[in-house]
Amino acid sequence: MGQKINPLGFRLGTTQKHHSFWFAQPKNYSEGLQEDKKIRDCIKNYIQKNRKKGSNRKIESDSSSEVITHNRKMDSGSSSEVITHIEIQKEIDTIHVIIHIGFPNLLKKKGAIEELEKDLQKEINSVNQRFNISIEKVKEPYRQPNILAEYIAFQLKNRVSFRKAMKKAIELTKKADIRGVKVKIAGRLGGKEIARAESIKRGRLPLQTIRAKIDYCCYPIRTIYGVLGVKIWIFVDEE
């Protein structure tokens, strides 16, 4: 049943690890989960709010000399386009937040971290705890399924053919240190009235092997024809 379950949860404790590290009494556990969601949503909203509208950013592809012009103007559903994941570690008086991000230009600006910490403090409304935020840049951005999904979303919103967008996403992974990748898009592809699914695959993808380190993401894309769903599996290595 490897294809019927979330690949990340299926491998939790073996090749995947938790993104939240804290202990709580059973009666306070739900409050801790809600607090984690507020922290992650606040960080994503901060990045979306401070993004320059209509600005363009050039990303040089690792797989070729092609330079991709990446439009930063996103809708409200794409606020986390460069964040791969956020780790939260809680102590008695400190909440450590580690943001793993592909392109941390926005958060490297002077005063950005301090401003984000103030926003989090207001959101959580906790007097006894302070925030300690650190940024971790992802070494190989196009090895991350979230970033590839954002690239596909940008292409589809600009009326690029879905097959061409999938092939370009596969090309971006060619020089990344991975052993296999699969991209699947479902919905009203090309504006057709009947929804269908299309996929493209390169290399191996052993979904039923628990020791296989597989990264996965599911990403919704809002288009004029409705919502398209993008799923990306990346086979990194086998332990």
From Swiss-Prot:
GO terms for cellular component: chloroplast; cytosolic small ribosomal subunit. Residues 50-74 are annotated as: Disordered. Residues 43-139 form the KH type-2 domain. It comes from the Eukaryota. GO terms for biological process: translation. PROSITE patterns: RIBOSOMAL_S3. The keyword Magnesium does not apply. GO terms for molecular function: RNA binding; structural constituent of ribosome. Keywords: Chloroplast, Plastid, Ribonucleoprotein, Ribosomal protein. It is found in: Plastid, Chloroplast. Part of the 30S ribosomal subunit. Belongs to the universal ribosomal protein uS3 family. This is Small ribosomal subunit protein uS3c. It comes from Hordeum vulgare (Barley). The lineage of its organism: Eukaryota, Viridiplantae, Streptophyta, Embryophyta, Tracheophyta. The gene is rps3.
